[in-house]
Amino acid sequence: MVNPLYHKHIISINDLCREELELVLRTAASLKSHPQPELLKHKVIASCFFEASTRTRLSFETSIHRLGASVVGFSDSSNTSLGKKGETLADTMSVISTYVDAIVMRHPQEGAARLATQFSGNVPVVNAGDGANQHPTQTLLDLFTIQETQGRLDNINIAMVGDLKYGRTVHSLTQALAKFNGNRFFFIAPDALAMPAYLLEMLAEKGIEYSLHESIEEVVPELDILYMTRVQKERLDPSEYANVKAQFVLRAADLNGAQDNLKVLHPLPRIDEITTDVDKTPYAYYFQQAGNGIFARQALLALVLNAELAL
């Protein structure tokens, strides 16, 4: 039976239904316990990073190598024809798609990944982040980590803290968890960085419970997952950044009264929104979360590039 993700573009987490999300997570769990070092042997995957990245790029490229595929690409678009000669994104994608079996792409412009799919022919495009819009593979590793630590993706109490306006990770994760049952959201952010109205409207339309809060401590005892984010300096003007950067900081003392199963997650990089004393608590799970990116991205690439996959 052909898997439903074969040759499918993965641009938004909304491109995947609940059953497809669960397929990716099952595949990720299988690859974590039973590596498949030749699964994508002879495949070539382009890693096209038009925006700076450390974890996402290295995680993708490690995933590609561990599946036996080859990787080509760039991590600095200023040295490409697009950056130096003014080539359009459309032409860049049209050419790259003739070289490779799949394209992994990060771009600072919202909608760029969707645009790329119009010029990639039959070559699937995987969005590694487009501006403040979507970051679907981060969401897949977040879901994998939540399931790994909680044993479920239904009936989760999750708080999202910090930059909820520009943070594409929280946008995608909110949309993904809304596909499951009984989840409850606690949003903790300064007014200037509040969760976008369209996401709150989506939750309300689905009858999903959410609430807005001014402090972390007031909700900690109710939580299964505490999802911290940094204030994104690169997306704010200096005066706005100075006003909000230290408004919500998690310290170990703030976790007094937490349930035993609570895990603190963060898409990283961490700046100063989680103090290092949290690292020593049993609740910290952000480094393991980052490591899970290998398995989530391996799973997605394996499914996108294999018509039939049974692990």
Swiss-Prot record:
Pfam families in the cross-refs: OTCace, OTCace_N
Species name: Yersinia enterocolitica serotype O:8 / biotype 1B (strain NCTC 13174 / 8081)
GO cellular component: cytosol
Taxonomic superkingdom: Bacteria
UniProt record similarity statement: Belongs to the aspartate/ornithine carbamoyltransferase superfamily. ATCase family.
PROSITE patterns, alphabetized: CARBAMOYLTRANSFERASE (PS00097)
Residues where L-aspartate binds: 85, 168, 230
InterPro entries with a match to the protein in the record: Asp/Orn_carbamoyltranf_P-bd (IPR006132), Asp/Orn_carbamoylTrfase (IPR006130), Asp/Orn_carbamoylTrfase_sf (IPR036901), Asp_carbamoyltransf (IPR002082), Asp_carbamoyltransf_Asp/Orn-bd (IPR006131)
Record: residues binding carbamoyl phosphate: 55-56, 106, 135, 138, 268-269
Entries under HAMAP family matching the protein: Asp_carb_tr
Subunit structure: Heterododecamer (2C3:3R2) of six catalytic PyrB chains organized as two trimers (C3), and six regulatory PyrI chains organized as three dimers (R2).
Annotated keywords: Pyrimidine biosynthesis, Transferase
Annotated catalysed reactions: carbamoyl phosphate + L-aspartate = N-carbamoyl-L-aspartate + phosphate + H(+)
Pathway: Pyrimidine metabolism; UMP biosynthesis via de novo pathway; (S)-dihydroorotate from bicarbonate: step 2/3
UniProt protein name: Aspartate carbamoyltransferase catalytic subunit
Gene Ontology biological process terms from the UniProt entry: 'de novo' pyrimidine nucleobase biosynthetic process; 'de novo' UMP biosynthetic process; amino acid metabolic process
EC number: 2.1.3.2
Enzyme class at the top of the EC tree: transferase
